Amino acid sequence: MKKENFLGLSERVVELGKQAEQYLTPYFSRIDEIADYNTQKVLAAFRAHRVSDTMFAGTTGYGYDDHGRDTLEEIYADLFGTEAGLVRLGFVNGTHALSCALFGALEPGDVMLSVTSAPYDTLLNTVTGDCPGSMKRYGIGYRQVDLKDGRLDLEAIEKAAAADDVKMVFLQRSRGYAVRQTLSCGEIGEACAVVRRVNPNAVIMVDNCYGEFTEELEPTQVGADMCAGSLIKNPGGGLAPTGGYIVGRKDLVERAAYRLTAPGIGGECGCTMGQNRLLYQGLFLAPHVTAQAIKTAVFCAKVMQMLGFTVDPA
């Protein structure tokens, strides 16, 4: 039976796609392997915390004792290998979650050291902007170590991180809008080891946006104290309507919660308004959805490369 060409693709394009897919078979196999591992990890966490439909019901008002919300935060902590988690619809995006984490961990007079060059534009406004409420306006300092040929400059990081006033070392896992390679957890672990050697009390913070479930490990499992991201990206599985997360040391997550709500309230309040089910379902699907997104990007890059375009990453 002749198959219908619903999209009106030319025979050349269809053949290019087949050739690209055949070439990418070993890459797709590795992506599937990671997705299978992470799906098992998520399922094991669901079983350990006895997830049931009773956790899907939301709360209104203050949101005290929201069982579904509190359990989901425990699951996130387990998945990332941390002491605590903060998973909230109140985070409007990843930048908001990162901002709460930064302001929670840093005080006036402290210095944040970014070792992956400057953060992306929206977060940079939070850190160095002249707008009211920025870290700069609160007297929190900022320095950076630029990447060397697109990779971490461990020698420069060791020197800069040793300064007494550096209270946080910040890494951006994703390339963001820069032309560089994404950091692997292995590379993040190497940087963490360098920082620990010269400044053991510094908080190591990772912007994990777009990085969740792309490897078997997460940054907090290789030495980072805390990481944050958005639920409308990987961990939401395409189902979470909004929100963000922070995972890490209990004291750091608690301080971030105080920034999200108010000192003395922290994570005790925060109604979920019937959205818990989507957050759970999205997290369950997240490893698979993330894998499909990576496959699509790899496939598109290969087809464009076959057509003569320069692609990055290649």
Regions found by a protein language model. Give the residues of each.
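Conserved glycine-rich beta-strand-loop-beta hairpin in the small C-terminal domain of fold type I
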Residues: 314
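Solvent-exposed, charged/polar functional surfaces in cytosolic regulatory/catalytic domains
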Residues: 75
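Conserved PLP-enzyme active-site core in the AAT-like
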Residues: 2-25, 32-33, 41-47, 52-55, ...
